[in-house]
Amino acid sequence: MDRQKEFVLRTLEERDIRFVRLWFTDVLGYLKSVAIAPAELEGAFEEGIGFDGSSIEGFARVFESDTVARPDPSTFQVLPWKTSDGNHYSARMFCDITMPDGSPSWADSRHVLRRQLAKASDLGFTCYVHPEIEFFLLKPGPNDGTPPEPADNGGYFDQAVHDAAPNFRRHAIEALEQMGISVEFSHHEGAPGQQEIDLRYADALSMADNVMTFRYLVKEVALADGVRASFMPKPFAEHPGSAMHTHMSLFEGDTNAFHSPDDPLQLSDVAKSFIAGILEHANEISAVTNQWVNSYKRLVHGGEAPTAASWGAANRSALVRVPMYTPHKVSSRRVEVRSPDSACNPYLTFAVLLAAGLRGVEKGYVLGPQAEDNVWSLTQEERRAMGYRELPTSLGNALESMENSELVAEALGEHVFDYFLRNKRSEWENYRSHVTPYELKNYLSL
């Protein structure tokens, strides 16, 4: 048994851990969990925990449903609150999902990302990610379609001390840091009730695990503070939606491969081709980075979200932004992709972003001129004249772009690609057939 497994088993005994929760993520990004007693963990390390894969979204067909969850000891952390008896703690580990013969399950989101990271490694790169995660705090209420009510009336950077949960961010950050997740900073975002917590850089797989842990902890802390948290991309028509702006960089050993001292923006050829790859394939990957019908209510003109495939230095109206806070700090050279929302599957999102960027690097894509104007204010004719391709305006548009994409099919693997398309087509058709209050209000008198 290796040292990490021995450390986990020893910690369970020393901390008197009562339950071990084994986590994994389905294809749509929902967190799944099975709890085992500490005495069962050594066996789980050796043989895994079997479960019915046909009962998990996108995993397996009923006639080939035996699936195994194998805990990854490197992800072991003690949860930051006690069990219901008030005397014990629980711990959690993420799992890799395999078939009974030990081969990776093609439906495992972690495996999808691992394959892209292995490709980056073959090219000599390690991928690091830093997300800005936005979400809303709402007052308690039914989940029946009733319009939600924000927990406060604050705005951008406001010190909202009179809200319904004045200590929420402090409580959330304390919980995150107890789980080994480093927070860079936090603040109130632009809309009432909207919060942002930025996680410090980590390798892409660890960060995807961190994002799943983040969403779980934030919801639990919110409930404890008497409010509820929502990662819905656009819960309020009149306010900006919730993004997960994703900062990415590639390193070669300890060297930032995105940095070049000879460029005016200090961007290397690798960085420029990486950006060009994301711009070229932006429409194809949109259904993954923005996977819900509601996601496209956020990606609208004037919504503080990208609507065209453009890039720029410090330009927040562009799809890809090059942050210029510290222009002479080599280690911080990075690109920020502004389209993903905080309700995406982070494993699949990081995988397709990396696949698009690496395609640009491998093929030597040439980056066009940067956007120096406010892209939101340009007409469609002006955008076309400048070479800015419109991003999908609906989930239906995004699926049309995705279904013929060799890049996305290769990045996700045939199983996840086919299931994702089937599931999302069903979601889109269900939405298209739904008659909304807007239609009744405006058209019933016809």
UniProtKB/Swiss-Prot annotation:
Residues reported to bind Mg(2+) 1: 132, 245, 336
Which positions in this protein are listed as binding L-glutamate? 241, 298, 304, 316, 338
Q: Which residues bind Mg(2+) 2?
A: 134, 189, 196
User: Where is the GS catalytic domain positioned along the sequence?
Assistant: 109-446
**Any GO BP annotation:** glutamine biosynthetic process
Keywords for this entry?
Answer: ATP-binding, Cytoplasm, Isopeptide bond, Ligase, Magnesium, Metal-binding, Nucleotide-binding, Ubl conjugation
Q: Which GO terms describe its molecular function?
A: ATP binding; glutamine synthetase activity; metal ion binding
From the record heading this protein, give the residue positions of the covalent cross-link Isoglutamyl lysine isopeptide (Lys-Gln) (interchain with Q-Cter in protein Pup).
Answer: 363
EC number in record: 6.3.1.2
Q: What class of enzyme is it?
A: ligase
The portions of this protein that span the membrane are none
Q: Which cofactor does it need?
A: Mg(2+)
Q: Where is the GS beta-grasp domain?
A: 15-102
Cofactor remark from the record: Binds 2 Mg(2+) ions per subunit.
Q: Residue numbers for the site described as Important for inhibition by glutamine?
A: 61
* GO terms under cellular component: cytoplasm
InterPro entries for the chain = Gln_synt_N (IPR008147), Gln_synt_N_sf (IPR036651), Gln_synth/guanido_kin_cat_dom (IPR014746), Gln_synth_cat_dom (IPR008146), Gln_synth_gly_rich_site (IPR027303), Gln_synth_I (IPR004809)
Activity control, per UniProt: Inhibited by glutamine.
Detail which positions bind ATP.
Answer: 184, 247-249, 316, 321
Q: Write out the catalysed reaction.
A: L-glutamate + NH4(+) + ATP = L-glutamine + ADP + phosphate + H(+)
- Where does the UniProt annotation locate this protein? Cytoplasm
Complex formation? Oligomer of 12 subunits arranged in the form of two hexagons. In its feedback-inhibited form, interacts with TnrA in order to block its DNA-binding activity.
Write out the function statement from the record.
Answer: Glutamine synthetase (GS) is an unusual multitasking protein that functions as an enzyme, a transcription coregulator, and a chaperone in ammonium assimilation and in the regulation of genes involved in nitrogen metabolism. It catalyzes the ATP-dependent biosynthesis of glutamine from glutamate and ammonia. Feedback-inhibited GlnA also interacts with and regulates the activity of the transcriptional regulator TnrA. During nitrogen limitation, TnrA is in its DNA-binding active state and turns on the transcription of genes required for nitrogen assimilation.
| UniProt cross-references to PANTHER family, sorted A to Z | GAMMA-GLUTAMYLPOLYAMINE SYNTHETASE GLNA2, GAMMA-GLUTAMYLPUTRESCINE SYNTHETASE
Q: Which family does it belong to?
A: Belongs to the glutamine synthetase family.
Q: Can you say what this protein is called? A: Glutamine synthetase
- The source organism is Mycolicibacterium smegmatis (strain ATCC 700084 / mc(2)155) (Mycobacterium smegmatis)
This protein's encoding gene: glnA
